């Protein structure tokens, strides 16, 4: 503990005794001290921070920017993106039938490959339910083409380079904003969202949940 030295005038010790009630060291008006980053009390510096002045966590603004904008019962933003063959594909082309739109992190990653192959294996069930499947990630069309060819994917993969559509739809990121989210939407024949399913670490459950919903609709 730091020692504080106070100058003492040359008086006899008894004269230093004061019979009056001592004043408190800190005034009752202490709350009027401005909440700045540094304040001085009795010559000592204290760091005082107001909660409103604290900087947000690094990923706070990023999380806000991807906070879910598309909700159940809403019509999501339209898009036109290139598919694995380099052709422009618009969401409006699928109006009149249910559409499963699933956003995934990246081609050729373990979880995304499992998810893609699970959609492939159940693709005929989706077709029987009258639905189309669309996968979207930030990979370019050539990556999608190789991915679809390698795993014999029969459905459309769209390239959202720059993740513009991901942001517009408000797909939430995972692991404190470091990992693109894995989220699936089911749109009805009118283009209205009827189901939103998010599960980063159980990619194959997206197929189970969406099929269950479509088959019960």
From Swiss-Prot:
Expressed in the leaves, roots and stems. Pfam families: AhpC-TSA (PF00578). It is found in: Plastid, Chloroplast thylakoid lumen. One of its GO terms (biological process) is cell redox homeostasis. PROSITE patterns: THIOREDOXIN_2. InterPro entries: AhpC/TSA, Peroxiredoxin_BCP/PrxQ, Thioredoxin-like_sf, Thioredoxin_domain. It catalyses: a hydroperoxide + [thioredoxin]-dithiol = an alcohol + [thioredoxin]-disulfide + H2O. The active site is at residue 112. SUPFAM superfamilies: Thioredoxin-like (SSF52833). Residues 70-217 form the Thioredoxin domain. Induction: By salicylic acid (SA). It comes from the Eukaryota. Keywords: Antioxidant, Chloroplast, Disulfide bond, Oxidoreductase, Peroxidase, Plastid, Redox-active center, Thylakoid, Transit peptide. GO terms for cellular component: chloroplast thylakoid lumen; chloroplast thylakoid membrane. Disulfide bonds join 112-117. GO terms for molecular function: thioredoxin peroxidase activity. Its EC number is 1.11.1.24. Thiol-specific peroxidase that catalyzes the reduction of hydrogen peroxide and organic hydroperoxides to water and alcohols, respectively. Plays a role in cell protection against oxidative stress by detoxifying peroxides. Involved in both resistance against fungal disease and oxidative stress. The active site is a conserved redox-active cysteine residue, the peroxidatic cysteine (C(P)), which makes the nucleophilic attack on the peroxide substrate. The peroxide oxidizes the C(P)-SH to cysteine sulfenic acid (C(P)-SOH), which then reacts with another cysteine residue, the resolving cysteine (C(R)), to form a disulfide bridge. The disulfide is subsequently reduced by an appropriate electron donor to complete the catalytic cycle. In this atypical 2-Cys peroxiredoxin, C(R) is present in the same subunit to form an intramolecular disulfide. Belongs to the peroxiredoxin family. BCP/PrxQ subfamily. Monomer. This is Peroxiredoxin Q, chloroplastic. It comes from Gentiana triflora.
């Amino acid at each position: 503990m730091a020692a504080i030295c106070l100058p003492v005038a040359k008086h006899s010790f008894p004269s230093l005794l004061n019979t009056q009630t001592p004043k408190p060291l800190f005034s009752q008006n202490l709350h009027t001290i401005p909440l700045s980053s540094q304040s001085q009390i009795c010559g000592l510096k204290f760091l005082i921070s107001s909660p409103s002045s604290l900087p947000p966590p690094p990923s706070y603004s990023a999380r806000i920017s991807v906070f879910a904008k598309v909700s159940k019962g809403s019509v999501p933003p339209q898009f036109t993106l290139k598919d694995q063959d380099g052709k422009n594909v618009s969401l409006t082309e699928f109006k009149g039938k249910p559409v499963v739109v699933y956003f995934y992190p990246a081609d050729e990653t373990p979880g995304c490959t499992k998810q893609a192959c699970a959609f492939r294996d159940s693709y005929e069930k989706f077709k029987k339910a009258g639905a189309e499947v669309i996968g979207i990630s930030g990979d370019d069309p050539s990556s999608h083409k190789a991915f679809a060819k390698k795993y014999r994917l029969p459905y459309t993969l769209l390239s959202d380079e720059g993740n513009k559509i991901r942001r517009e739809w408000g797909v939430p990121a995972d692991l404190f904003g470091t990992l693109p989210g894995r989220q699936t939407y089911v749109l009805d024949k009118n283009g209205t969202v009827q189901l939103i399913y998010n599960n980063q670490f159980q990619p194959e459950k997206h197929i189970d949940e969406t099929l269950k919903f479509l088959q019960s609709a």
